[in-house]
Each structure stands twice: as C-alpha cells, then as structure tokens.
C-alpha cells in the first residue's frame, strides 16, 4: 500500500493526511497559543507497518486511528464520512496484522483489483447476513444491467443502493462500450463470465473530462448509514473520488422527490417494518408496503425516455390486494414492457424467496400492445446452498430475446410471434381482461392441443416401466435384438 504522506516528504513536500494538527483548548478557545496538538502522525501507514511494531501495538494504534479519523481536519471529507462512528471489529492482534499485511501488498495503481477484493468481501458478508440484508448475486446484477444497457450520457439511480453493486456494474458496462479492445461488443454479463478477463484498460476511448462527467451521473440512496459507508468505499475503490451516495429515506422523505433519471436499477428491500411504511402523499398508489412503494417510486422518477429494471418479490406479480392491483394496472398501461421470472433459490444461501424482474420503458410501453414474459429455470448455477456453476444457463438467451423485442418495439405495436421454450408474448388486453392485471406469465401461456382420436393416458397404464437395472435376456426377441 502506497504511503502518500511518505512519498510527499520524499519529494520535498509535507505530510498532509496523517500529520499532527491543532485544536482549540476548551478552557482558552480564543487563545491560539494554547491550542492542543493532536498527534496523528504516529498512525501513518509507514509507521503502523514498521517491523518493530508488535501485533498488540498495531491493534492499539489502528483502533485509535479509526476512532480519530472523523475528527482530523486533514483527512478528506469523504473518508471522514466513511469512518464516522466506526469501530474495529477485529480484536485478535495477529489476525489484524495478517489482514493489514495483505492489504499492504496492494498498490494504489491496483485500485481495480482492490475494488474487486472489496466486492468479494462484501459477497462473503452478504452470505453471512452480517450487513443486515442479503445482496443481489453478481451475475444477476450484470444480467439486469446488460438488459437495460445504460450509456455514458444517462443519469443513473439506485434508490436502495446497498453496497452500490448495480452502480458499479453499470459503470463498468459503459466503460466496456468505450474500450478499444472490446471488438466483440461484450456486455458486462458476458465480460464477467470470463475467469481471466480478455482485456483490461476499460474505457480507454473516453477522454478524462468524459470520465468525470460519467462519474457524476451515478446516484445512490440508502436509509442505512452502514450501507452508505460501504457504498462510498466500494465506489471510491472503483475510481469514484466523490461518489453521489446519500443517506436518504426514499419512501418517507420528500427532499429529492423532484429528481428524475434516465435509468433506474434496483433490488429494494422486500420486507416492510411492523405497521408498514409511513409514506408521504406524493405517491400515486396508496399503500404502506415497501415493495409497492418502491416500484411506484421508480416508475414515477423516470425521465420521459427513461428505462428501469427492478427485482421484486412475487407479491407484486399476483397479490390480490387493492394496492397491488392498482400498481400492476398503472405499470401495464404506462410503463411495463417485460417480466422476467427468476427461479426460487437465486438468492441462496441467505434467502429462498421467489423473485421476478420488471422491465420498464415509457416509450416502448406506449407503443406496444403486448408484454414480453420470460421464465428462467436455469440462471447458470444450481439452486443449492453453494450455488455452483452448471451448464445450460438461459440468461444470455434472455438478453438477446429482450433486446430483439425492444428493437422491434420502437417501430411496431406488435411483434412477430415469440414462442420459445423460455419466452412468449401476451396482449395487454388479455392481462387487463379480468381486472387484476396478474403478471404471472404461465397464466397466459398457450396450452398445447393434440388432435387425436385416442385418449391421453399415462405411460404406465399401457406399458411396463422398468428402471434401475440392465435388460434381461427374456426382454430380447428371437433374433437377439432389443
């Protein structure tokens, strides 16, 4: 790990961040000669990692440094915010020493690797539930981002950003679009499937000013100060020097209601607190359920040509309550163009909840008379606790089907018939027919009709089913053939 203070001194400058500073003496607040000196230089990385510092001393120094970080005026505000009210959870000196030694092997120029390492730590935390809510699997984030396909001029929001996974994936997806080596036009889902990345230098076709403007386009809200802190760190490690992450109650506060965006990506909390949410009066749908309010919020905060992808629990799809039906009616009539059903177990091992993805685009929704339904049975991983990779994943096929549907949707109200193993189209009129606007795709799937004079029966009624053994000689005919 580079010690920037040490490098500054070696180049003839002065230590800036981990340097001693003065604060007024409470008894003599107006007498600068009596200011107290706070010794912060002893916490500099070079001194902390000195070979003569024991593990116990390191634990003490590191704990003191974290506790004093937010008070040091020499530390940039971003980091003071990150370390506000934090503490060191590691109490074993040798464990901390090993951890810091590993971190010390990174260089500042390795920010991408450091960011990837941090995201790995977040995934481990998520599987253990340490951060208070489970996280969206990386491949599902990338899948959703690849579908929405944000570009460099889009303003992008995650209204329940957690650790900023959607924002970082969208950022990398955009960089890929402007990478010289990306001759295949890989999207972020395809790129991240490679264990060894096919190329680096993402975004090398963007000018420095373009990158600065791009970074300012990303915005995240979260009600949890811990999640905000994790987002700030994660984004900083991915090149965001001043991330636009705000501790904000998306559903109860009106302060940012008038903001709108070109792209919204989200996996908001599914659970409502006891007694429900107490939202303000600006929502179109009257409800105290968080999943209803978040979908309403996203739909209402898209720009006229905006598009969104949101992961929702099954209640949004078919619940019969008035608020759920009103929400689905609003979506079908004004916002929704596709529904992707995900298999139960996508969020294993920390939740077996069944979810779907709602895809919104006002422009397409106004032109289309149909909604596209896709059912994913295989997301590329088994549905056990460990979620190991398996063959036959359907996500890439789904991306292609959706993109083809969107391309046609900008020109025509209806499409050539789509009826594949995983996708089919349903007229909006059929969805609206019984008034509940149910978004379960299987409900509208064409039933196979068989023209035959013979009744359909189970195989075991007309044949003996033998399994689990090798054929015996009596099963063969006179010629010895089966």
Enumerate the predicted regions with their spans.
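Long recognition/docking surfaces used for binding and targeting
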Residues: 5-125
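Conserved S-adenosyl-L-methionine
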Residues: 130-266, 271-273, 279-282, 288, ...
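Conserved nucleotide-binding/hydrolysis micro-motifs of P-loop NTPases
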Residues: 163, 252, 269-272, 314-317, ...
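Conserved Class I SAM-dependent methyltransferase catalytic core
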Residues: 223, 228, 288-360
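DNA target-recognition domains and sequence-specific DNA-contacting regions of bacterial/archaeal
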Residues: 261-267, 299, 460-482
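Conserved hydrophobic/aromatic beta-strand scaffold that supports enzyme active sites
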Residues: 355-359, 373, 436
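Short, intrinsically disordered, charge-balanced linker/junction segments flanking boundaries
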Residues: 374, 392-405, 472-482
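Non-catalytic DNA-recognition/assembly elements of restriction-modification systems
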Residues: 406-407, 412-413, 417-472
């Amino acid at each position: 790990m580079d010690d920037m203070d040490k490098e500054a001194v070696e180049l003839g400058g002065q230590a800036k961040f981990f340097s001693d500073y003065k604060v007024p003496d409470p008894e003599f607040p107006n007498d600068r000669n009596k200011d107290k000196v706070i010794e912060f230089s002893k916490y500099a990385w070079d001194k902390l990692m000195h070979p003569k510092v024991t593990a116990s001393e390191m634990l003490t120094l590191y704990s003191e440094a974290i506790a004093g970080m937010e008070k040091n005026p020499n530390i940039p505000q971003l980091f003071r915010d990150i370390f506000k009210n934090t503490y060191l959870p590691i109490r074993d000196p040798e464990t901390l020493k090993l951890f810091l030694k590993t971190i010390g092997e990174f260089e500042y120029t390795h920010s991408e690797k450091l960011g990837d390492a941090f995201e790995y730590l977040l995934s481990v935390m998520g599987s253990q539930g340490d951060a208070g809510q489970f996280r969206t699997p990386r491949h599902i984030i990338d899948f959703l981002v690849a579908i929405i396909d944000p570009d460099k001029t889009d303003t992008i929001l995650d209204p329940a950003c957690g650790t900023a996974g959607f924002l970082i994936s969208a950022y990398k997806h955009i960089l890929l679009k402007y990478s010289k080596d990306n001759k295949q036009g890989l999207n972020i889902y395809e790129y991240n499937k490679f264990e060894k990345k096919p190329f680096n230098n993402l975004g090398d076709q963007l000018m420095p000013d373009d990158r600065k403007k791009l970074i300012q386009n990303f915005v995240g809200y979260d009600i949890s100060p811990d999640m905000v802190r994790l987002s700030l760190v994660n984004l900083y490690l991915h090149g965001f020097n001043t991330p636009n992450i705000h501790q904000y109650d998306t559903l109860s506060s009106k302060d940012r209601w008038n903001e709108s965006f070109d792209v919204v990506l989200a996996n908001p909390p599914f659970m409502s607190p006891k007694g429900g949410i107490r939202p303000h009066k600006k929502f179109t749908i009257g409800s105290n359920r968080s999943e209803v309010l978040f979908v309403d919020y996203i739909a209402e905060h898209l720009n006229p040509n905006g598009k969104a992808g949101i992961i929702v629990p099954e209640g949004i799809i078919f619940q019969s309550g008035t608020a759920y039906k009103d929400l689905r009616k609003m979506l079908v009539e004004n916002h929704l163009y596709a529904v992707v059903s995900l298999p139960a177990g996508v969020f294993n091992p920390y939740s077996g909840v069944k979810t779907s993805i709602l895809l919104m685009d006002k422009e397409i929704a106004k032109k289309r008379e149909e909604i596209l339904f896709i059912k994913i049975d295989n997301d590329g991983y088994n549905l056990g606790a460990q979620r190991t990779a398996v063959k036959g994943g359907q996500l890439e096929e789904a991306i292609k089907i959706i993109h083809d549907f969107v391309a046609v949707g900008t020109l025509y109200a209806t499409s050539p018939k789509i009826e594949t193993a995983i996708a089919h189209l349903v007229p909006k009129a059929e969805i609206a027919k019984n008034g509940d606007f149910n978004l379960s795709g299987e409900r509208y799937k064409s039933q196979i009709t068989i023209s035959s004079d013979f009744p359909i029966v189970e195989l075991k009624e007309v044949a003996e089913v033998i399994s689990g053994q090798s054929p015996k000689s009596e099963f063969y005919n006179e010629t010895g053939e089966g």
